[in-house]
Amino acid sequence: AAQAVAVAKANAKIQGEAVLLAPQKGYGEVSWKTPIEINAFEVPVKEKVDLLLNVNDVAMQNGASFVNSAIFAVNEQKYFASTDGSYIDQDVHRIYPTFNVTRIDRTSGQFKTRNSLSSPMGKGYEYMHARPEDKVSGIVTRYKGRYDMLEDVKEAAKVASEKIKAKSVEPGKYDLVLDPSHLWLTIHESVGHPTELDRVLGYEANYAGTSFLTLDKWKSKNFKFGSDKVNLVADKTQVGSLGAVGYDDEGVKCKKWDLIKDGVLVNYQTIRDQAHIIGEKESQGCCYAQGWDDVQFQRMPNVSLQPGKTKLSVDDMIKNVEKGIYIIGDGSFSIDQQRYNFQFGGQIFYEIKQGKIVGMLN
């Protein structure tokens, strides 16, 4: 604490302008906890190890040449106190089961992989106990709410073998149908990071640069980010999500707000010393610190594309596609230093012809 005060005093000597913190009321003694059913740290290590060994065994039985698997679990216990009068106790849980399956064709020397289609979640170990309603059926089974690791790895091993035999895509122009397991990374990199106000202002340029969503575009109130059907929201309150907490690391209560509304850029992500720059009276609660001994700074909340008015299946989405590719899972990616031009790979690719999936592509 004494060192922090000394650093602050030293920085003040070369400060160009005063730091303006958005007002923040004190909440007194409050607490927040990730709503979980099973604490992953109370599950015996043997039970987790046995599950992973079973995952590996199922993969090998279904054609995998190599497989590795893991379950990452985090329990962050955080206490925040401020001179605003907030004393906030938070108990945050996160979990992420994952695997990577490789299939080698020793005759041709080709090899293909498929990773898990799980998601890191703000949940307890109940995430590992999938129910029928948690499964989204289709050409590949996907999951919501909970995850079946054994079922997914069995399918993954078979898909890796299919990928070796799949034909190469022919160069040309295609309509793309993007599965949520793929689209999340596109949203994260081309919407989430570009709407971080510190990147917009040039304060942050680490790991793929600043932002093309400059203040003049926001001030115009008519910058078209996408079609009228595109609505993207920031939300740190979504139950079960990876980014959900009760309060950020400046003691700001978390909330939900619009970033893109009817295809138009309407807002950014802010913390307390940025809010006044865009005329906001309060922070949007986007401040994170890695630990008590690190300076907190801006980091995106959950950023999500909102569903349309009509519920659609994959078949509904592809039925009018004459020539397209349906992409499942995330792969390699690259993006320019303003996050404007980008490419995102996938894991599984299916060719669409005349509204039907006709086969797998490489």
Which positions does each model-derived feature cover?
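N-terminal small-residue-enriched
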Residues: A1-N362
